[in-house]
C-alpha cells in the first residue's frame, strides 16, 4: 500500500509542473532551461524544466533514486512510461508575470484565505492522468510527484496522494481504475492576481465526474 501511494504522488506532481508554468509566463521565443532544488515527499529533489516559445517541452524531478520525467504529455518513471496527461481547458485568461523559479505550492496565502477575496478568474481545466497500470499499484511518492508534474506547482502532494489511494481502496472493483480525472479551478487574489492564486481541485475516478474520490484546495505563489 505504501509503495502504491508513493507512485501516485509522483505522477501528479509531474503533470503539475508543466502546464501552469507554461501558461503563466510571458517569455521570448528563445529556449530557456530552469533548474532549482526543493523538498518533495520528504526528500531533497532537483527540478528541471525547459521552455520554448512560452511552453514547457520537458520537465524532470530527481528525488532519491527515482527520476520522473515529462516529455510532451507523457510521464516516465525511471525510463518506463507511467502515464499520459490529457488536458481540456474550459476557460483561460493569460497573465503576464516575470519569469523566476515558478509556481510554489502554499498552504496559506500572504493576503489571506477568504474565498471571496479570490475574484480574478484564471483558468478552469479538466486535467486527466491516464496511468499505465491500476491506480492502486503505485506508491504514494510516485503518485505525488506525478501530480506535481501534471499541475506545474513545486510542492508536496503527499497528503493528496494518500487521500486518493485511501478513498479509492474502499471503492468496489477498484482494480479497474487507471485514470485520475481532475477538475481544476484557479482564481487570483484581488490584490495581486498574477502572483497569488487559489487552486480548487476535485478528483474523480470516472470521466463523467460521478464517482468522487476527494478534493483539495491550496494556494500557489509565483517566486
Residue ranges of model-derived segments:
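Sec-dependent signal peptide cleavage junction
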Residues: 6, 15-36
Amino acid at each position: 500500500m505504501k509503495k502504491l501511494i508513493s507512485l501516485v504522488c509522483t505522477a501528479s506532481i509531474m503533470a503539475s509542473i508543466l502546464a501552469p508554468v507554461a501558461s503563466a509566463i510571458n517569455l521570448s521565443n528563445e529556449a530557456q532551461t530552469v533548474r532549482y532544488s526543493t523538498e518533495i515527499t520528504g526528500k531533497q529533489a532537483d527540478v528541471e524544466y525547459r521552455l520554448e516559445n512560452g511552453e514547457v517541452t520537458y520537465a524532470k524531478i530527481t528525488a532519491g533514486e527515482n527520476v520522473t520525467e515529462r516529455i510532451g504529455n507523457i510521464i516516465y518513471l525511471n525510463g518506463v512510461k507511467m502515464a499520459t496527461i490529457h488536458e481540456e481547458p474550459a476557460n483561460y485568461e493569460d497573465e503576464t508575470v516575470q519569469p523566476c523559479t515558478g509556481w510554489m505550492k502554499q498552504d496559506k496565502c500572504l493576503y489571506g484565505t477568504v474565498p471571496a477575496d479570490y475574484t480574478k478568474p484564471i483558468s478552469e481545466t479538466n486535467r486527466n492522468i491516464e496511468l499505465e497500470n491500476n491506480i492502486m499499484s503505485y506508491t504514494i511518492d510516485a503518485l505525488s510527484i506525478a501530480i506535481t508534474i501534471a499541475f506545474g506547482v513545486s510542492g508536496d502532494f503527499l497528503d493528496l496522494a494518500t487521500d486518493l489511494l485511501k478513498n479509492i481502496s474502499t471503492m468496489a472493483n477498484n482494480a479497474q481504475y487507471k485514470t485520475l480525472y481532475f477538475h481544476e479551478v484557479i482564481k487570483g487574489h484581488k490584490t495581486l492576481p498574477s502572483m497569488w492564486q487559489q487552486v480548487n481541485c476535485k478528483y474523480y475516478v470516472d470521466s463523467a465526474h460521478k464517482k468522487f474520490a476527494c478534493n483539495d484546495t491550496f494556494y500557489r505563489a509565483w517566486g
